[in-house]
């Protein structure tokens, strides 16, 4: 009889949590309080790795500024979280969809139906990283810090000359030695041993939120804390962008709506026009020269 291979995983996320050993004996309210108390430890753990996260952000900014792309690689929960983050960036900031891309072990079908075996395929990770170039940044996400799919993707990315980042829930991951930046969050044992969709997944979501948002802010996709990178293509978006323009300028909704119309729905062009009084072509030229940054365009126009 054929025996399937067995590998004992010693990752911190696989350990039993001494605080939750009696969870199956508790009433609902106490179960929820216990889960909530464990969840509350995650932001503190993420705070400990902010210096490493800052290095990853700076790499992402440099790569996108010079025409490269950011690639996320993950399996299971990690891949789903990465896919969600990449999908949200175009509607939130207006960045082109091919600039930040997610690769999930097993492809699109695995986003809905778990395909646990594919995460063990090193060669599949390498194959999915075939489009990574020396101009790019590859970010691998693996709670255990040892997923072969992610290891394969980062291995192929390194061969291509790309910069590499590893996000794990194991500060001592064996894969860390081969990447430029390791963000190892010490989330510890899960509420349910090995269920990394919980604290480890929460940490990954916080890191992805912070990483992509900081990169977009650094690249000028916001003005102050306002989303100005979105092109208003329907009535709902036009209404939202008019509200943003009134917040940014203090002008009336009518003036902002007219400026947005003249700018063909481009919020950044409309904002530059409203703040400086220049026409649409001048605002568009200034933004192009400033790589889309409203503040940089305003500084340049102030000099002329």
From Swiss-Prot:
A lyase-type mechanism (elimination/hydration) is suggested for the cleavage of the lactyl ether bond of MurNAc 6-phosphate, with the formation of an alpha,beta-unsaturated aldehyde intermediate with (E)-stereochemistry, followed by the syn addition of water to give product. GO terms for molecular function: carbohydrate derivative binding; carbon-oxygen lyase activity; ether hydrolase activity. InterPro entries: Etherase_MurQ, Glucokinase_regulatory_CS, MURQ/GCKR, SIS_dom, SIS_dom_sf, UBA-like_sf. This is N-acetylmuramic acid 6-phosphate etherase. It comes from Thermobifida fusca (strain YX). Pfam families: GKRP_SIS_N. Pathway: Amino-sugar metabolism; N-acetylmuramate degradation. Its EC number is 4.2.1.126. The lineage of its organism: Bacteria, Bacillati, Actinomycetota, Actinomycetes, Streptosporangiales. The active site is at residues 88, 119. Specifically catalyzes the cleavage of the D-lactyl ether substituent of MurNAc 6-phosphate, producing GlcNAc 6-phosphate and D-lactate. Keywords: Carbohydrate metabolism, Lyase. GO terms for biological process: amino sugar catabolic process; N-acetylmuramic acid catabolic process; peptidoglycan turnover. Transmembrane segments: none annotated. It catalyses: N-acetyl-D-muramate 6-phosphate + H2O = N-acetyl-D-glucosamine 6-phosphate + (R)-lactate. Belongs to the GCKR-like family. MurNAc-6-P etherase subfamily. Homodimer. Residues 60-221 form the SIS domain.
């Amino acid at each position: 009889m054929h025996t399937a291979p067995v590998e004992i995983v010693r990752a911190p996320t696989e350990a039993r949590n001494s605080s939750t050993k009696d969870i199956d004996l508790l009433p609902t309210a106490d179960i929820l309080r216990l889960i909530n108390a464990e969840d509350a430890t995650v932001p503190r753990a993420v705070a400990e790795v902010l210096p490493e996260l800052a290095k990853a952000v700076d790499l992402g900014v440099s790569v996108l500024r010079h025409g490269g792309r950011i690639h996320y690689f993950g399996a299971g929960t990690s891949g789903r979280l990465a896919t969600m983050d990449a999908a949200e960036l175009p509607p939130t900031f207006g960045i082109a969809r091919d600039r930040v891309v997610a690769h999930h072990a097993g492809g699109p079908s695995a986003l809905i139906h778990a395909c646990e075996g594919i995460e063990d395929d090193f060669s599949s990770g390498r194959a999915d990283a075939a489009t990574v170039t020396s101009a790019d940044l590859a970010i691998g996400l693996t709670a255990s810090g040892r997923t072969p799919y992610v290891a394969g993707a980062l291995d192929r990315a390194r061969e291509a000359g790309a910069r590499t980042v590893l996000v794990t829930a194991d500060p001592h991951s064996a894969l860390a030695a081969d990447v430029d930046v390791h963000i190892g969050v010490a989330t510890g044992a899960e509420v349910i041993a090995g269920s990394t969709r919980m604290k480890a997944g929460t940490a990954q979501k916080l890191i992805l939120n912070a990483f992509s948002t900081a990169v977009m802010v650094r690249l000028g996709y916001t003005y102050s804390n306002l989303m100005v990178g979105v092109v208003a293509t329907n009535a709902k978006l036009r209404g939202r962008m008019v509200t943003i323009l009134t917040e940014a300028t203090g002008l009336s909704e009518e003036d902002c709506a007219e400026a947005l119309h003249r700018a063909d729905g481009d919020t950044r062009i409309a904002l530059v026009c409203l703040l400086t009084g220049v026409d649409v072509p001048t605002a568009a030229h200034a933004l192009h020269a400033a790589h889309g940054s409203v503040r940089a365009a305003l500084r340049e126009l102030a000099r002329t």
